[in-house]
Every structure is written in C-alpha cells, then in structure tokens.
Amino acid sequence: MSVTAKDIAKKLNISAASVSMALNNKPGVSDELRAKIFDTANEMGFQYSKKMLRKNHKMIGVIFIHKNFIFDSAFFSELGNSIEYRLKEYGYRLNAYHIHEHCDISLELQKILKDDPDGLILFGTIMTDSEIRYFNQLSLPVLLLDAYFPSFTGDSVVINNVDGARAATECLIDHCKVCPGYIRSSSTFPNLRERADGFYKAIRDAGYHSSQAIVHEVIASTENSYADMIEIIDRKEPLASCYFCDNDEIAIGAIRAFRERGIRIPEDISIIGFDNMSYSSYVTPPLTSVNVPKAYMGKIAADRLLDTIRSEVHYPIKIAINTDLVIRKSVK
C-alpha cells in the first residue's frame, strides 16, 4: 500500500494540511518542520508526484537583459556570486538567463517560465520603463536589482547613488579647496544619472555653479576611458585639479592616461572612483572609491525574494543600500 500524506501526518503527530503544504512547497510551514516532513516521507517510501518533484527542485532565475552592455565586469560577478551563495544556503539553485537586444522579451519569458522558477531576480541596470511592463504581468515574485521604476509592481534593491557621489565630491572639495571636475560615462543609465545628481548637488551646496565644473565624457571601460582621456590631454583641453569618476574602471583608465602624460596622481590631480572593486586597491596609486557593499546587496536581494515566495501577502518595497567612502592614496 502506498504511503499517503495522512500516514506521514500521523507519524509526526501533525495535521495532514501541514504535510501537504510542505510537500507542495507552499508557505505556512517552518523550515525546520518542512525538513522533518521530507525526511519522514523519504524514510516511509512516499512516492512524489511529477508536480511535487518539479516544485521541490527549488530554483530562482536571474535575468540579464543585454543591449550595448555586457554584464562581465567584476561588479556584477561579485553581486551574482553573493546571490548564488545565499540561495544555496536555503536549498535553491540559480539559473542564469540572458535576453539580448532585439529579442522579443515576451517570447523569452515564455521560455524561462517553462523551467518553472519559484521567483526571478532581474538585473535592471540598463532597462527602460517600457520593458518593465512584461515583468509586471507575471504571477510569480520578481525582484528588480540595481534599478528602480515607479511603475514596477515588485520589490527593488538599489544603490544609494546620489549620496555616494555626493560624499565623494564633498571629499574632493574638502581636500582640494576647488570645484571638482567630473569624468562621466557616455552612457545614460539611471544609476549614472543619479551619480551625476549627487555630484552637482555637492558642488552647488559648496557654493559653486554647475557650469564651473570641468566635465569629460568617456566610454565606461578601463581601456576606452584611457584612450579617451589621452585624446583630451593631447588636445590640451582644460583639466581640473581633482575629479569624481562614474566608476572605478573610468577612474583607473584616467589615472593611466594622466601618468603616461607626466601628470602625477595625487600631487597634480586627485581622483575618486565609484564601486570599490577588489582590484582598486592594487592600482598605482591605490584608488579612493565609493564602496558598494556588493555581497550584502546580493544577500538582501536573495533574502527579500525568498521572503516574498514564502509569504501569502506581499507589499512591494524599495531597499536602498547605502555606501561608504574608502580613502586610499589617489586624493592628496
């Protein structure tokens, strides 16, 4: 005779409803009791249905939407590793999905949903408001990471870009006693617009006019920012005595260009980056940078999504992760 949920409930002296919720991976049962139910079911030789087997292969999908942007930087690697590590602690595996430019998002989502994920984490760094609507229509929990859109109906975990950029700019003003310059990305992602807001807020609060800032626009990678800054220096464009940069890659490329043209860092020009990548402490000179706690950010994103999966009632929230400034040797 086959073992039933009632048999398991009788052995554990709990309700059959609790057993059913656990075996069907539904909320309402503690993790400890859920584990005990599965252990007992296995000991008694319980035969799982195909649906149960599928639902108990717990899986979270992580979606990257590519345009003229590749998620290959150390920032996204550290963030993704943190998410995967946290999910494994709770018995979930992670599947990564890539939706490339010109792909039909609706069709790609249909393919993803065939894998029956319990929830989705969406890297929204380069997304637009019009693309978010596809994810609002889904019946499973979706968390938006590294972006925020008021129209999105799920949770969002973002960086406090404005305050981070403002703190970096204020540091330059305090140390250099002049209006800082800005080496900004040619991209216009929401994160970068927020960093620009923080930069300009800091210089205005210090009594400078926005037009006083010397601004250079570069392509946001180490090699491209190096090449762009070499051209700017060789054209003899005006240079500031200190700069805030949109990210560490830009800052490191700029430092290389300045040093190759005989400009000393920080004696002649001070520089601050953003992201505090692991390699930023190894460049010459070690880079002062706005630290984004990437491991913590990934953990918070994973925890919040799992909470939503387990909960019967959901109230969307926006979580802003604060930054701190790591002082090294690139500011005099």
Regions found by a protein language model. Give the residues of each.
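Glycine-rich phosphate-binding loop signature in dinucleotide/nucleotide-binding domains
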Residues: 44, 114-116, 175-177, 232-239, ...
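N-terminal helix-turn-helix DNA-binding module of bacterial transcription factors
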Residues: 1-56, 332
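Alpha-helical recognition/docking segments in bacterial nutrient-uptake
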Residues: 57-170, 233-238
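Hinge/beta->alpha junction and helix N-cap segments in small-molecule ligand-binding domains
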Residues: 65-78, 96-104, 157-167, 183-230, ...
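Periplasmic-binding protein-like
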Residues: 117-123, 181-184, 215, 237-247, ...
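Alpha-helical structural signal in soluble globular domains
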Residues: 40, 82-86, 134, 194-207, ...
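Flexible loop/turn connectors
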Residues: 228-332
